[in-house]
Swiss-Prot record:
InterPro entries tied to this protein: T7SS_EssB, T7SS_EssB_C
Record bears the keyword Transmembrane helix: yes
Family: Belongs to the EssB family.
Keyword Isomerase: no
One protein family per Pfam: YukC
Subunit structure: Homodimer.
GO cellular component terms, semicolon-separated: plasma membrane
Membrane topology: Single-pass membrane protein
Main subcellular location of this protein, as a coarse class: membrane
Function: Component of the type VII secretion system (Ess). Required for the secretion of EsxA and EsxB.
Cleaved signal peptide residues: none
Source species of the chain: Staphylococcus aureus (strain NCTC 8325 / PS 47)
Name the UniProt record assigns to this protein: Type VII secretion system protein EssB
Length: 444
């Protein structure tokens, strides 16, 4: 049997795999960002790994260094709700999600930068906002967001969540002040500050919550059997909840007792006991005071074998008012969490503590019997290069300073020499003038 030739069907067959391929490419672009190395200064390459560090404000990511670029792969999964999805939520839920966007303003107080836009914004299952693309100030885009720009974009997001006909880009680019919408949208636009905007959203959210609680109820017609099993289930759940709360209570008590025990040892200058007491505590969950106690105790015990002057200098830097990340660094270092210590030191841009953490990491690699020779060589080279990079930069700064001082001294010597020559010429000229006057007197 001979089949009829149908060009339309053949065209559809050809387009189908192309469409699937294009969809795959689109997903790849959403899940991946590529940054050319040519757009980054070589001395900033080591900072790029900050883009894969876990942060409550960003989607988890993995950084891969290629020959000519850095690739960032984002872990976007079913636990992440895109901004566009909240448009279908109930009004009270929508307001709750929108109200939480204010948390992203905290990013402006860190080294990170981000983009506040619908296609860049996701939410966790708890409704907390997380951004996709992140940058580093003065290192890699995006540029920092000013307070005014953050407020403008925040307003545009709120309006777009309730009015799907509006374009976010158009609102941000100048149409926000000209927008004529509902009284709710007008109030959003009129908010002059972030606090006023969030206060208004919170007010609307509370009204919606009250309305739902007063006017809505869910009633089901069920039989006695269902009620019986519900009662049994609730009783079981209550017992489990009480057991969990009891466990949590005693865990917290035990944790607090250890903190207090460490403090008492610190007051007695028993620094070794402080380290032993805090040995397996999670530094990220400790307050600043506890971190200070550990940091000072660690330096006092001189586990690193530091010279006296170096030790005293570090002790002067460790105070109750020190940066919390700086104090956390010493706990991570003391507990052997060297990768975390290196990340913190790099983030703080402190060469002294970065070198100390790198030296400890190299010793750890050297003494790790589980590593193969190839892996040990690879790891050693990786961290040696980072250490040498810091040493080279410090030497360059030192050489430039010495050269500058030498040039200043040379210029000073030349100035003194010129002054001496001028004084000598003045004296010679004065002597000649004197001799001329004497000669003139004799001729009279």
């Amino acid at each position: 049997m001979v089949k009829n030739h149908n060009p339309k069907n053949e065209m559809q067959d050809m387009l189908t795999p192309l469409d699937a391929e294009e969809a795959a490419k689109t997903k790849l672009r959403l899940d991946m960002r590529e940054i050319p190395k040519s757009s980054i200064k070589p001395e900033h390459f080591h900072l790029m790994y900050l883009l894969e560090q876990h942060s409550p404000y960003f989607i988890d990511a993995e950084l891969t260094e290629l020959r000519d670029s850095f690739q960032i792969h984002y872990d976007i999964n079913d636990n992440h709700t895109p901004f566009d999805n909240i448009k279908s939520f109930t009004k009270n839920e929508k307001l709750r999600y929108l109200l939480n966007i204010k948390n992203l303003e905290e990013v402006n107080r860190t080294r990170y930068t981000f983009v506040l836009a619908p296609d860049e914004l996701f939410f966790t299952r708890d409704g907390l906002p997380i951004a996709k693309t992140r940058g580093l100030q003065n290192v890699v885009d995006p540029l920092p967001v000013s307070e005014a720009e953050f407020l403008t974009r925040y307003k545009a997001l709120v309006i777009c969540a309730f009015n799907e006909k509006q374009s976010f880009d158009a609102l941000v680019e100048g149409n926000l002040e000209l927008h004529k919408g509902t009284p709710f949208e007008t109030k959003v636009i009129e908010a002059a500050t972030l606090d006023l905007l969030t206060a208004f959203l919170d007010e609307q959210y509370q009204k919606q919550e009250q309305d739902y609680s007063q006017n809505y109820a869910y009633v089901r017609k069920v039989g006695h059997t269902v009620f019986k099993w519900v009662a049994i289930g609730m009783t079981t759940l209550s017992v489990l909840l009480i057991a969990f709360l009891a466990f949590l209570y005693f865990s917290v008590m035990k944790h607090n007792e250890r903190i207090e025990k460490g403090y008492q040892a610190f007051v007695k200058d028993d620094y070794t006991q402080v380290l032993n007491t805090y040995d397996d505590l999670d530094g990220k969950k400790l307050d600043k005071e506890a971190l200070y106690i550990y940091a000072k105790s660690y330096i006092q015990t001189n586990k690193q074998g530091l010279e006296k002057d170096k030790k005293e200098n570090l002790l002067n830097n460790v105070t109750p008012n020190s940066n919390k990340d700086y104090l956390l660094y010493w706990m991570e270092l003391g507990q052997g969490h060297l990768d975390e210590a290196i990340n913190i030191a790099t983030y703080l841009d402190d060469n002294d503590i970065t070198k100390l953490a790198l030296i400890n990491k190299l010793n750890e690699i050297k003494n790790n019997g589980d590593l193969s020779n190839d892996k040990r060589s690879e790891e050693t080279k990786k961290y040696n290069d980072k250490l040498q990079d810091i040493l080279d930069k410090e030497k360059q700064v030192k050489d430039e300073k010495a050269k500058s001082e030498e040039e200043k001294a040379k210029a000073k010597d030349e100035k003194l020499k010129q002054q001496e020559e001028n004084e000598k010429k003045q004296k010679e000229q004065a002597q000649k003038d004197k001799e001329k006057r004497q000669e003139a007197e004799r001729k009279k």
